[in-house]
Amino acid sequence: MKVTVVGAGAVGATCADNIARAALAEELVLLDIKEGLAEGKAQDMMQTAALLGFDTRITGSTNDYSKTAGSDVVVITSGLPRKPGMTREELIGTNAGIVKGVAENILKHSPNAILIIISNPMDTMTYLALTATGLPKNRIIGMGGTLDSARFKYQLSQHLGCSPADLNAVVVGGHGDTTMIPLIRLATWNSAPVTKFLSTEQQKQIVADTMVGGATLTKLIGTSAWYAPGAAGAALVESILRDEKKLFTCCVSLNGEYGQKDICLGVPVTIGRNGWEKILDFGLDAEEQALFSKSADAVRSMNDVLKTL
């Protein structure tokens, strides 16, 4: 198996490192536009192989897409962060050009690849990748909800005093601090509803802290997080390559599911060798469905910016 990670920044490099450590692929390519960055990080990772015991061959490349040929899965992390004074339209315009170019170049050399989108704004970049490439919808996956759900489990574990691994909890909707919807009503701790163990105030606090999880980290460390986003991308790669059929929240194309069409939003899906394989309807209540519709409206307004480019 062969995996490519486009973008050798903190998120991309962390994702690649997780993939290598787990021995998910025989070959791993790290690609970046900045001269020497991908090559240097690839060599650094390869020098851990003797210490960590993996055999994945990691290659770095400066913008040479021929090195990515034959990739089974491609993780796209490319794009610029939003800078002070930059409008939403400017951010979308800049990153849309980057993501579209990356996807087109990748598919020239790996026409059968499954694409995992991490670039922001993630919901809109996933929609762009789908519409610009014309790929079957199951081969375009936005990572956002996988990360948001992991952050939700972290917040729950802190209040419950339990292992995050013992929790089942998902976040649906858009990948943004005003568009995500942590479904605390459906969250369980080894099959028991978490709401049995948490006060109403605690539940509200957990939801609020989950929604600003990314912003909280940016404030603390001065830049966007990278460990959890990178790990989330690698977890999706693992479920694809090992055909695990694991359940994740991912940003995928909807065609009537959850009452939405012509949009990519975070919903529960199974992830296997064919990409995303099945959307699960968790049965939102009236309040949750209203929030989901509001989230869709916000994401759709972001997508509308693409039409002006």
Would you name each region that the model predicts?
Residues G12-A13:
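N-terminal Rossmann-fold NAD(P) dinucleotide-binding loop
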Residues A8-G9:
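Glycine-rich Rossmann-fold phosphate-binding loop(s) that bind the pyrophosphate
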Residues T87-K153:
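Rossmann-like NAD(P)(H) cofactor-binding subdomain of soluble oxidoreductases
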Residues M1-V3:
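Extreme N-terminal starter segment of soluble prokaryotic enzymes
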